[in-house]
Amino acid sequence: MKFSIIIPSWNNLEFLKLCISAIRKNSSYPHQIIVHVNEGADGTAQWVKEQEIEFTFTPENAGICRAVNQASELAAADYIVYMNDDMYALPRWDEILADEISKVPGDCFMLSSTMIEPYDTGNACVIVADYGRFAENFNEKKLLEEFSSLNKKDWSGSTWPPALVHRKWWEKVGGYSEEFSPGMSSDDDFAMKMWAEGCRIFKGVSASRVYHFVSKSTGRVVRNNGRIQFLKKWGIKQSMFHRFYLHRGEPYAGALKDPPFTFPYFAESVLAHIQKQLS
């Protein structure tokens, strides 16, 4: 099964080379790779041309939302995968996602591969195991030997990359909302748009794995206040969306349901309403 893999990149060529290399050698199927080159001051545009990789370009950093939207215009496959440029896809990552697709009724769902990260960020959805934090000290051999033995169950609450969604639904919800540029909280906003369209399957697939170097580019940009934007747009806090809707980080238990009107939900709703009025 062929995917259209969208990778935004901002002067991060060494990680991008690793990312593309891993997709090419560790995928079970040939995929369409589309890079959005932000600025490209480090030679990224020239390199992707030499590699005959499809790409879109902006002379400045367009931010995640605009970048993935521009790249998605070139997507030809039925399924779009949004992947970060500091990710290393592990063997059969795509085959396992394709198998998962065949088990899900319909095409309205979000799936994520499971990230392995070198240090603990408090994210219950990832596996913590250090195989290097930079391209130059990446222990690829050890990772390939050990990644499949790292313990993790399927988890609920898929919203972040590597994220897979049918192109029909990507287009129906309008891709990523550019009012969230440069991108803080844009993953949750996209998931909430999918929820509003009736999507109730947000599954993190344990056996499909990528190594994530956690190379932060957000420190180089002026951040949008995504939490307040999300609250004003949807009337709930992101923490409510994670806890009551997505059950993020909990063992996967099937399609999600609308949150029951319990006292904790009521209390959080009241606080969210007050915060929205004050913001």
Which role fits each region the language model picked out?
Residues 21-30:
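Short, acidic, metal-binding catalytic loop of nucleotide-sugar glycosyltransferases
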Residues 29, 37-46:
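A conserved acidic beta->alpha catalytic loop
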Residues 58-75:
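Glycine-rich, basic loop-to-helix element that forms the pyrophosphate-binding segment
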Residues 65, 143-168:
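A recurrent flexible, glycine/aromatic-enriched loop bordering the glycosyltransferase active site
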Residues 80:
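Short aromatic/hydrophobic "clamp" motif used to bind/position activated sugar donors
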Residues 91-131:
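Conserved donor NDP-sugar-binding/catalytic core segment of glycosyltransferases
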Residues 116, 181, 203-221:
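Active-site donor/metal-binding and catalytic loop motifs
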Residues 156-174, 180-209:
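A short, conserved alpha-helix in the catalytic core of glycosyltransferases
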